[in-house]
Amino acid sequence: MSRSTKLTIGLIAAAALVLAGFLLIPDRGQDTPAAPEASDTAGPQLVREDSPRLSEGSSEVVFVEYLDFECEACLSLYPTVEELRAEYGDRVTFVVRYLPLHGNSLEAAQAAEAAKDQGEFEAMYKALFDNATEWGHQETSQRELFFSYAEEIGLDMERFEEVYDDPATAKRIEQSAADAQALGVTGTPTFFVDGKRLEPTRVEDLTDPLDAALEG
């Protein structure tokens, strides 16, 4: 299957989920996330110094995804983003921002942040998406499962738990959500290339802006 075909399938699947109502509706019945308290008075930023990076490209081009690890549309487009990373990852910096909308997505983001503390954000990012059907849309906390992923990755579990439970970790995620709200991001996934918001309905809506930015 070609790269273009894979990307198209991912976009079609995500679009179908939007139509089915999976994109914005959290498990708790809210249509939008509760307004978070911003921890930084300097104003909203699309990318912060502590924002997780999946890759550090050789150019100044930055691809940002606002995601919710429990979001069905994010899961559908996860392979698409992986294809983009395979194609552009050596040249483009891929940044993740959090917008938790579902019942366990905050704790999933905490797990990702705790793994990032040990230099293993990408490994946890993949574990959360690869095992999403195992933990997603559950009514109870999936903390034990997230910790099992950390063990499988080989993290220092004492340090992982310390960062996972640290109020500063939740505050960083809260800041990401506050930035999202200030930037007009209300659903996931939402993509940006060099600060410009994308509205992808076809493969070229993602690849063309990347190509143009790299050529600029």
Language-model-detected regions and their locations in the chain:
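Extracytoplasmic thiol/disulfide redox context detector
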Residues: 1-101, 174-177, 212-216
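C-terminal cap of thioredoxin/glutaredoxin-like
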Residues: 1-28, 151-216
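Solvent-exposed loop/turn segments at secondary-structure junctions
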Residues: 69-72, 99-104, 130-135, 168-169, ...
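Sec/Tat-exported extracytoplasmic proteins
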Residues: 70, 85-88, 116-119, 128, ...
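Stable alpha-helical elements in mature extracytoplasmic
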Residues: 77-80, 107-111, 120-124, 142-146, ...
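Structural microenvironment flanking redox-active thiols in thiol-disulfide oxidoreductases
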Residues: 87-150
